[in-house]
Amino acid sequence: MVSVEGRAMSFQSIIHLSLDSPVHAVCVLGTEICLDLSGCAPQKCQCFTIHGSGRVLIDVANTVISEKEDATIWWPLSDPTYATVKMTSPSPSVDADKVSVTYYGPNEDAPVGTAVLYLTGIEVSLEVDIYRNGQVEMSSDKQAKKKWIWGPSGWGAILLVNCNPADVGQQLEDKKTKKVIFSEEITNLSQMTLNVQGPSCILKKYRLVLHTSKEESKKARVYWPQKDNSSTFELVLGPDQHAYTLALLGNHLKETFYVEAIAFPSAEFSGLISYSVSLVEESQDPSIPETVLYKDTVVFRVAPCVFIPCTQVPLEVYLCRELQLQGFVDTVTKLSEKSNSQVASVYEDPNRLGRWLQDEMAFCYTQAPHKTTSLILDTPQAADLDEFPMKYSLSPGIGYMIQDTEDHKVASMDSIGNLMVSPPVKVQGKEYPLGRVLIGSSFYPSAEGRAMSKTLRDFLYAQQVQAPVELYSDWLMTGHVDEFMCFIPTDDKNEGKKGFLLLLASPSACYKLFREKQKEGYGDALLFDELRADQLLSNGREAKTIDQLLADESLKKQNEYVEKCIHLNRDILKTELGLVEQDIIEIPQLFCLEKLTNIPSDQQPKRSFARPYFPDLLRMIVMGKNLGIPKPFGPQIKGTCCLEEKICCLLEPLGFKCTFINDFDCYLTEVGDICACANIRRVPFAFKWWKMVP
């Protein structure tokens, strides 16, 4: 490059000094210039002194020299000698800083030559919240900004996905380069600051290019606020735009950009996005290409979607508006009041089956140091939906995202309902501070086997922070793991315990209970005695005595099969979650094998599937120590349901309050049980996901 004075200015990383005339160079803050000290040394030179001006740091033989110091170093002339030079701040004018090297012969008092390097320091940097404290700070290590490191001692900036419900189904038009962003939305975006400083006569000869790769530009958007102090922001980087040129007009440029992700990590997207600013010199000769003189890079990681176990404190209960059955809403509302939770109604969605609220949606959250956002992740089973009423039911500040599914059959396992999250666990020395995602699967290849689609499975694995565990659930009609297991919170974590218990469905425990009651003389007590005949008929059930249930060999064989399936999962859970038998409570529950209902004949498999014989006790609403449990309508012993009594005996000594909810009118129908009629938003983990090491 040529300066305004016509002197040759160098951006080279190695500078060769001259005794005949000064050398001029530009040094970008954060970079080093290597000086060849021996190349121009006079013959018979035996030593040299070197010093620099106030903004220059010099390193010779691992000795750092500042303005106040001179270093006299003896060095054989035959050995190449180098010094590294760095600038500590930008220069106020061209050639405002310098390095002088004076050479001496055998007589140290008589210098035999002097070489001078004039320096012009400029700053070109991109800065982000690299230290994850919510503040944009200048990094002392330029190379560190190019990496993203997990763990408590790690570093690297974080991006949040735009989960604004208003943007669901909407795409920013390719040609639309302006967007109004309100002040409350700004807090969701991550800041990226561009700093450029130096003499204007130097800077104006270059241009700055802010850029990313074409692939990464599809995963995030970068906005630049307009100068009119309005809420209008210019889209400078995003889908179909991976580079943006800024003009350098003055001696100081400081601009803040706002960045949002538009996709969570997935099989095709690692979650890492890098942005660079390049200082580009345009050639005066048309035959010579432009030259990139310097590039600074920062790396963001898109915050993962974190799923929340039912052991976390509840905040808000969402209920299907069309399911306001007699007593149901009142009971759930009372439960919510006991746990200081709000109740919200959800708009009816005529395009989706009644189970959609819980089976196809999950409350989760995403988090950066500056912001935590709760959101609904929706995996709609109905294809080609044009509208999503759920997004209009959410409380302010709650996000909404759609994760497409592939299998849209009625009995599909390809939905977020086929997922549960364990509380935090430690397994063989490995900690999972955010718990582990539990996925229902078919476990082995089968012509009729069902499983979560690869797309959804890969999405769950790609989040990295809740290492998935696959369970065998294809034996269930719904295929969902929450039909045979549930976690409840305990207060004993500080006493060396895990802080939770695992409840597992147990047909054998149910048969044991019924045999006990039979021996006590209650064999004629009726299951479903409290229900009307039309209720039983609509659900394919009939009232039976304990004697009849115990004499039903077919039902017994069906439950022996179910017991084997649950036992397989029990072993997996003990291994993968580090559980022991004392962490597990067996809940009496019977199942029966049936064909799928309400599905087209071409989707009907040959085999039968298990479904709860009476309302599933495991499908409870967990609200701290308050449990909303489906009323099982078990045999009445002295006016008390023996199943309810058993549950209370198991759980109430541990401090739980059991409320049994009559939801039989939606049991086994398209609606399902109470868990499918409600979904709960919970408190996010206190632990920050970036402090773990996957």
Swiss-Prot record:
Q: Where in the cell is it found?
A: Cytoplasm; Cytoplasmic vesicle, Secretory vesicle, Cortical granule; Nucleus
**Gene Ontology CC entries for this record:** cortical granule; cytoplasm; cytoplasmic lattice; intermediate filament cytoskeleton; nucleus
What happens on changing N598S?
In OZEMA16; uncertain significance
Identify the domain of life: Eukaryota
| Modified residues annotated as Phosphoserine in this record | S10, S446
Under the heading SUPFAM superfamilies, the entry gives: Cupredoxins, Pentein, Peptidylarginine deiminase Pad4, middle domain
A GO molecular function assigned to this protein is: identical protein binding
Output one GO BP term.
cytoplasm organization
Keywords of the record, alphabetical order, are:
Cytoplasm, Cytoplasmic vesicle, Disease variant, Nucleus, Phosphoprotein
What is stated as this protein's family in its record? Answer: Belongs to the protein arginine deiminase family.
Note the subunit structure. Homodimers. Associates with alpha-tubulin.
Q: What does this protein do?
A: Structural constituent of cytoplasmic lattices, which plays a key role in early embryonic development. Cytoplasmic lattices consist in fibrous structures found in the cytoplasm of oocytes and preimplantation embryos. They are required to store maternal proteins critical for embryonic development, such as ribosomal proteins and proteins that control epigenetic reprogramming of the preimplantation embryo, and prevent their degradation or activation. In contrast to other members of the family, does not show protein-arginine deiminase activity due to its inability to bind Ca(2+).
Q: What is this protein called?
A: Inactive protein-arginine deiminase type-6
